[in-house]
Amino acid sequence: MACTEFSFHVPSLEELAEVLQKGLKDNFAHVQVSVVDCPDLTKEPFTFPVKGICGQTRIAEVGGVPYLLPLVNKKKVYDLNEIAKEIKLPGAFILGAGAGPFQTLGFNSEFMPIVQTASEHHQPVNGSYFARANPADGKCLLEKYSQKYPDFGCALLANLFASEGQPGKVIEVQAKKRTGEHNFVSCMRQTLEKHYGDKPVGMGGTFLVQKGKVKAHIMPAEFSSCSLNSDEAVNQWLNFYEMKAPLVCLPVFVSKDPGLDLRLEHTHFFSHHGEGGHYHYDTTPDTVEYLGYFSPAQFLYRIDQPKETHAFGRD
């Protein structure tokens, strides 16, 4: 697979915390950003296979929306253990947002990769989830992937944050009561873009929606047989939902595209009450509460970039 490597601008955690504190204040009534020790992510509500998101951090964007839209390209299937090798970090802990491995599932779905990949020292562990619209009633059906399937596949497109999965210092972001127009991730990403300009900064990690509800979507199980050539057509195809806290979210975002046709932000989420999908924004600005832990990425790996591209279907 073709792979392009790019070095991000990596400010200190203290500087990033200061920048995010100022930017988030324009969008939330209560904001507290600080540098802390990463909480133990093996514990609830995260239940990840590793304790942290630190060590040799990188972002990988694999494939892209043009492999899904306007019509699906079913040749575009991937393996997360192989992706870990591509990004020069076998054994990496990978989290993020992507399309479910239809090659195994037999249908299309939203995918929440949470994987400690294989290395010489340990077997891989798959903590991933997938969400689909229940064929019976159209409601969300969230399942843990490894309870049914032994592989480490994904497909079409994925935005991934990878690390050694180590404990360490991270940026903690608390934000309550949204007063602005932007969602939590967009606000952070745009704050970084405004401050750092042409020096791209990449970040990933996890955040909780502790209170409130969010607008989400789940792709249909059947790929579209007719061309979807606009955001309007895509939105008519998608299934939209309102889902309630507590939600565990897996954000990946980049402040500015260095010319690699990136999806600048992409967040999927799961929960322990059967809801999961693609995060758009909260629908309860007065009561919403976010708590997140983030780490800056050192490198970007653009894997299997589509040669023919377009700008729709990336919300």
UniProtKB/Swiss-Prot annotation:
Keyword annotations from UniProtKB, A to Z: Cytoplasm, Hydrolase, Metal-binding, Nucleus, Zinc
Chief subcellular location: nucleus
Compartments reported by the entry: Nucleus; Cytoplasm
Binding-site list for Zn(2+): 266, 268, 278
CDD domains: DUF1907
Cofactors: Zn(2+)
EC number: 3.1.-.-
Class in the EC hierarchy, top level: hydrolase
Signal peptide from the UniProt entry: none
GO BP annotation list: DNA damage response; regulation of DNA repair
Entry GO terms, CC: cytoplasm; nuclear body; nucleus
GO molecular function: hydrolase activity, acting on ester bonds; zinc ion binding
Described function: Exhibits ester hydrolase activity on the substrate p-nitrophenyl acetate, in vitro. Regulates DNA damage and repair by regulating HIF1A degradation via chaperone-mediated autophagy (CMA).
Known partners and oligomeric status: Monomer.
Name of the protein in its database record: Ester hydrolase C11orf54 homolog
Record organism: Rattus norvegicus
